[in-house]
A protein has these predicted regions:
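Active-site entrance/lid segments in N-terminal catalytic domains of soluble metabolic enzymes
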Residues: 2-189
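Hydrophobic alpha-helical segments that mediate membrane insertion or helix-helix packing
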Residues: 37, 202-203, 211-214
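Extended hydrophobic/Leu-rich segments
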Residues: 71-75, 208, 215
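Catalytic cores of alpha/beta
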Residues: 144-152, 195-209
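Active-site-proximal beta-strands of protease catalytic cores
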Residues: 157, 207-212
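Glycine-rich beta-strand-to-loop/alpha-helix junction loops that act as flexible
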Residues: 190-194, 213
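Single conserved hydrophobic/aromatic residue that forms the stacking wall/gate
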Residues: 215-224
């Protein structure tokens, strides 16, 4: 049975065991956690800016992507019947991010499969993701920003509704999903107070394809 609302959902979003993207959390989301999430069958993610750097040392983001990519590749070779889900990198697209263009080049180099963009929709970022076969999911808090993101080349949307962490929006998930689904038939994720199987199922019934949450993965040894 096809539980997804989109008619053209990318394979990268359907390859996991559950329709879940583990949200990229400031400081908390690190390679150990991302790898564990992917091996468990959900898309793990981290903000690029979590890979903090020290002067004179190798570029930390490159080290993180190398480790995640190689470890997931090794897992998939050893477990062909139980492959890991893909991973995602969150890029803060706001022009106050001095690392953005360099970090984009590194993500292209490592063929990051899923890009989560926040705080600004820029066509050149979407084009970079597409150049390496990636897809772009853009954080939005209302229908106006949703339209702008798609117009500028994003592949899908993450509806950040009331109750979500980070840059949360004020709208009810019921209203936000309904507004977007009136015109958008592509990949649509929902974020906001989703922490149980019942909430996941309700999100899918409302019209979301996937949900974004992380709280249930935090009390794990890999995130300590």
């Amino acid at each position: 049975m096809n539980i997804h609302s989109s008619t053209n959902l990318p394979a990268v979003l359907t390859s996991g065991k559950l329709p879940v993207v583990a949200a990229p959390l400031f400081i908390i989301s690190v390679p150990d956690l991302v790898i564990a999430q992917c091996k468990a069958g959900v898309i793990g993610s981290f903000p690029a800016l979590n890979a903090r750097e020290k002067e004179g040392e190798p570029i930390e983001l490159e080290r993180w992507l190398k480790r995640i990519t190689e470890e997931l590749d090794r897992h998939n070779q050893e477990n062909p019947d139980n492959p890991a889900a893909p991973f995602a990198v969150n890029q803060i697209v706001h022009r106050s991010n001095p690392r953005l263009m360099r970090d984009i080049e590194i993500c292209v180099k490592w063929n990051v499969p899923v890009w989560i963009t926040s705080l600004g929709a820029r066509p050149e970022v979407n084009e970079a993701a597409h150049s390496c076969g990636g897809i772009v999911l853009h954080d939005i808090i209302n229908n106006t920003f949703a339209r702008k993101a798609i117009e500028k080349g994003a592949d899908g949307l993450i509806a950040v509704a009331a109750g979500a962490g980070g840059h949360a929006g004020p709208q009810s998930p019921f209203a936000l999903i309904q507004e977007i689904r009136e015109w958008f038939k592509g990949p649509l994720l929902l974020s906001g107070s989703i922490a149980t199987g019942r909430a996941l199922l309700a999100s899918l019934m409302m019209g979301a394809d996937t949900v974004s949450y992380t709280h249930l993965t935090l009390p794990t040894i890999c995130s300590v």
